[in-house]
């Protein structure tokens, strides 16, 4: 089969760097904004229609859900680096094999997640010290959410394929459609039919099925080199090794962060449903606020990977400087707005005064340090794009898992207040910033990539 192989429309290897990054990141931002909208719709609608305990049930499931899907999504992210590198090098045969191997992996992983999520949810939620008053709703939400695991995994894979070749416009369109579907179903199931917490998760699962279907149809009907043929979905040994080599560290990084956050959430749970609801509302706000930074780092990963594949090493260095500057500047601007309007923002999710007080305190402790979080994510994106995804995994393991867990385990014993738990985030963001900076300037990662490519 012959494909159109015009390179320029989706390539990040040409054109002014700042404009190229922004043009690619903007649809990513809008797409992720709508994704956050349908994630947040569950919390907003559940909190306002069903009360703070129902909101606590949704919030307590969040970190556990990310733990379950983080490994798979990280592997998909790492595979996107491989696809982007082959796209930059114009090696379309290897790109095709990588794409179809990744889809085969997604089918297996999605099925496994469904089984694990459905069967082990009560055990996992109890291990998190979820209060008994919240537990039934948490189990209902968690189990229903995981009925859509296959669609969720395949959508993220298909979206990653499109983004790896520089197409951030179509994923945006599909996310807008699925977000509208999700919010409409949330209002119908919870607001009109009063079907309970589980129906909010059902709305999310249905909307994910819609976005996955649209994304898959786009890939199957494409005449480009990244076209998907269902008959070619199978495992290729070399492609699978490359996917796991680049993706497994990224997946483990996601899981590492999630494990630490589950421990932090367990400590928050000990302060009761009001603390759970307030901090859960903050996590939704943080998800929105940090979106522009997340999208710049996603763009930076693809930019670095494509340009390294094209051997444009000077362009990589310039792109890194632009990406870090934009990300840090945006992060602190958003942090200031969240800090100022914190009570009103938390109040959107719950009218309970104690929940609002907990949420505002947590928010105003963490947001001033968003620049550290932004910088760390940029560094992780750079090394991931260079195929050195083990570096961010190890940094996150040390700073965001081991040290964070050790801190909350011991600090709360001596200072048993929620603010002590909140400080776990700024402290570990600062440590990861320090470690990443030392490695970036002291190691020879760029030349190591050149040598590896010459050997290949």
Give the role of each language-model region.
Residues 23-42, 144, 155, 178, ...:
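Transmembrane helical elements of multi-pass membrane transporters/channels
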Residues 76, 144-163, 171-179, 200-215, ...:
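Short runs within selected transmembrane alpha-helices of multi-pass transporters and secretion channels
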Residues 55-115, 152-171, 265, 278-342, ...:
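Small-residue-rich hydrophobic transmembrane alpha-helices
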Residues 14, 18-37, 41, 64-71, ...:
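Residue-level signal for short hydrophobic patches within transmembrane helices
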Residues 1-25, 83-150, 192-248, 304-369, ...:
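Short alpha-helical transmembrane segments in multi-pass integral membrane proteins
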Residues 28, 32, 44, 48, ...:
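Transmembrane alpha-helix boundary and packing residues in multipass membrane permease domains
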Residues 33, 37-56, 125-132, 188-195, ...:
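Helix-terminus/linker motif at the lipid-water interface of multi-pass membrane proteins
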